[in-house]
Amino acid sequence: MPGFLANADLSANPIELRRQQITDYIDLTSSNPTRNGLLFPPDILAEAAAPYWQTRRYQPNPRGLFAARQAIAGYYAQRTPALTIDPAQDIFVTASTSEAYALLFALLTNPGDNVLAPQISYPLFEYLAEMFRIELRSYPLDPQRGWRIDPWQLARLSDERTRAVLIVSPHNPTGMVVKQAIPVLQWLGLPIICDEVFAEMPFAIPHVPPLAAVMPNVPIFTLNGISKMYALPDLKLGWAVLNPPARQYADRLEVLNDTLLGANALTQSMLPTIMHRGHNFVVQQRQIIQKNIATVMNRLASVDCVRVRAPDAGYYLFIEVLTTQDEEAVVLQLLDAGVFVHPGFFFGFDQGCFLVLSCLVAEPQLSQGVQRLVDGLRLIVAADV
């Protein structure tokens, strides 16, 4: 059978099968803000949408509604450090960050090419690589250095068919942020696709610097959107921002975005008001997440079999469990104990036993779930003796 994932096994894995059989469990994997009480103020959304209905007229633009691009440029002008973005030529509005990734894969690669991506990452990259018939080469993150990128691995993995480097900063799920220039990227000269969707959720650092500000001389496509920043995954809007060295790709990217025109006009028209009036919500959401992370880390600090590093940013914790059992067995036993977490191998990491926990989960479910996690882990590790 030809086509996408034609030969793949898409049946449910043992963890999903067990989860479907259990009803009384607390889900500590949830990343949906609308299911965790983080709802962007409806009065602001109503205000943002009202002018569209009064003057409704579809005027498609392959780069996105100019007012939306102006709002995005204004956002980057307020980042630390600030980025100067030309809304006329540097911004492309998309239906989502995932769509922006797909556009950039189409822009930068041909079948048989390869891109470098972090070894620990979510499955999106693998699916995109399959879609575009390219090779995904995984570069490791160094756990001894706070999951920092190993520059020598980037150099080792690249060859004449390497077309781009994917960087997720803040990284999902380790929370690592690239805070300084990586000289080998300058030497390679490859375009960088930088995913910054967790940029407004710092924890162990005061702010998340835009990579395009840290490395201004390398072609960088910066991706973000309203799904994480404003807890609006249902309104479907993202963007790609080009720094000056990346402008050479703008004309071809315009053709690609014009081919899809995925971003809907209503959400684009709402964006200036969302960004202008949404700052208080962003701060409130950040404070809730920071409090949740601190609560969970304090609770886990008393558990001898657990090691957890404070994330630079984001809302995930990447937890190491000191056990002889494999991750799948641990997660299945935790499900039986009434709590659901993801194993590290779901994110492509197969060293030791790591669990991924979302601190977006609302109280009291978060504290109750963490208590079940702690109790379950103590029983699991006790069985190792």
Q: What residues fall within each predicted segment?
A:
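N-terminal small-domain helix-loop-helix segment of the aminotransferase-like
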Residues: N7-S96, I274-R277, L379-I380, V385
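PLP-dependent enzyme catalytic core of the Aspartate aminotransferase-like
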Residues: G74, Q78, A82-I85, A155, ...
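Conserved PLP-anchoring active-site segment centered on the Schiff-base-forming lysine
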Residues: L107-A129
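Active-site phosphate-binding strand-loop segment of PLP-dependent enzymes
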Residues: P143-V208
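Conserved core segment of the aminotransferase class I/II
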Residues: A213-Q290, M297-N298, G376-L377, A382
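Conserved glycine-rich beta-strand-loop-beta hairpin in the small C-terminal domain of fold type I
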Residues: P272, I288-M297, V308-V321, Q351
